[in-house]
Design a protein with these regions (language model features):
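Short leucine-rich amphipathic alpha-helices used at interfaces
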Residues: 4-5, 12-13, 89, 139-140, ...
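N-terminal start-of-chain detector that recognizes signal peptides
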Residues: 13-15, 29, 62-64, 99-101
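A short secondary-structure junction motif
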Residues: 15-18, 22-25, 63, 107-110, ...
Length: 152
């Protein structure tokens, strides 16, 4: 888990600065009416962080694997990230990810193998690793070719 949290902290530090350097116009521009702007992609990553944080916490103590799923388009629309200030969404994303690092670093190793239902059953260790892959995939949508990652 240390590898995951180290990598996540490095990504958050680097991309807080890189994303902050994107102009407000570019950050808010929608490629198509039905596609997310870079701002909304970062909002989606914030929603992902919120839902995964819940998985990492509830997954430790629930007797049965908790089912924690979410409808990503609804979350992005409900949060209305497109109307948020650029600095606010970046800071929210940054803080949520640092909280994930803190929770994962505090998690006893014997709980890494506990499962959570994300639509299918996965261990908390797997979810943590997948979270970073998912993050990289979407950061590539904000700053092209930042990572060599294939995420399906």
């Amino acid at each position: 888990m240390k590898k995951v949290t180290t990598e996540l902290r490095e990504i958050v530090t680097e991309f807080t600065t890189k994303i902050g350097a994107i102009s407000a116009a570019e950050f808010s521009a929608k490629p198509l009416a039905n596609k997310w702007s870079k701002k909304e992609v970062l909002g989606h990553l914030t929603d992902s962080a919120q839902n995964n944080l819940r998985r990492f916490i509830c997954g430790q103590y629930e007797v049965e694997p908790p089912k924690i799923t979410y409808q990503q388009d609804f979350w992005v629309a409900s949060n209305n990230y497109q109307a948020m200030q650029k600095e606010e969404i970046i800071e929210l994303w940054r803080l949520m990810n640092l909280r994930i690092c803190a929770v994962l670093e505090n998690m006893p190793e014997n709980l890494y193998s506990k499962e959570c239902d994300t639509g299918s059953l996965h261990t908390l260790a797997w979810i943590a690793e997948d979270y970073v892959k998912h993050l990289k995939h979407h950061l590539n949508q904000i700053i092209f070719e930042s990572f060599d990652v294939i995420y399906v």
